[in-house]
């Protein structure tokens, strides 16, 4: 079995790790072992952060929609339920953008949701009377 010398491959992989660690504090950017630990840790945080970003944006959108709903005299949950009852399928990102930039359009959506809820409630009451 031939002897394996890892000179160029080892140097390349170490350079790659140290390049990723550039800008880290003290030995974390200079010594391979410390850089390796710091890079691994950083990559774990980056992975988690990509998942958290989705959660954080959804929470932000819900807060913005809720604020506009309250201004229109409706709670967030009733607004979303009313939109579903009206057959409108807008996602939270679009609703938050409309709430932030076009108040008149959002008020129209809120009125549409209110009317759909009223129709649904009257249908429920009619069924109860029978």
Curated annotation (Swiss-Prot):
Keyword rRNA-binding listed: yes
Keywords, in A-Z order: Ribonucleoprotein, Ribosomal protein, RNA-binding, rRNA-binding
Keyword rRNA-binding recorded: yes
InterPro entries: Ribosomal_bL20 (IPR005813), RIBOSOMAL_L20_CS (IPR049946), Ribosomal_protein_bL20_C (IPR035566)
Superkingdom of origin: Bacteria
GO cellular component terms listed in the entry, alphabetical order: ribonucleoprotein complex; ribosome
Record-level GO BP terms: ribosomal large subunit assembly; translation
Example GO molecular function: rRNA binding
Family that this chain belongs to: Belongs to the bacterial ribosomal protein bL20 family.
Chain's role: Binds directly to 23S ribosomal RNA and is necessary for the in vitro assembly process of the 50S ribosomal subunit. It is not involved in the protein synthesizing functions of that subunit.
Protein name (database record): Large ribosomal subunit protein bL20
Protein's organism: Solibacter usitatus (strain Ellin6076)
């Amino acid at each position: 079995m031939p002897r394996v010398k890892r000179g160029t491959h080892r140097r390349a992989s170490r350079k790659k790790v140290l390049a990723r660690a550039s800008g880290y504090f003290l030995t974390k950017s200079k010594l391979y072992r410390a850089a390796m630990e710091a890079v691994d840790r950083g990559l774990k945080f980056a992975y988690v952060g990509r998942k958290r970003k989705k959660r954080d944006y959804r929470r932000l959108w819900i807060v913005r929609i809720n604020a506009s709903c309250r201004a229109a005299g409706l709670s967030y949950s009733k607004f979303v339920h009313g939109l579903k009852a009206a057959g409108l399928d807008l996602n939270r990102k679009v609703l938050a953008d409309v709430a932030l930039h076009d108040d008149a359009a959002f008020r129209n959506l809120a009125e549409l949701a209110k009317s759909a809820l009223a129709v649904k409630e009257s249908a429920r009451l009619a069924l109860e009377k029978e």
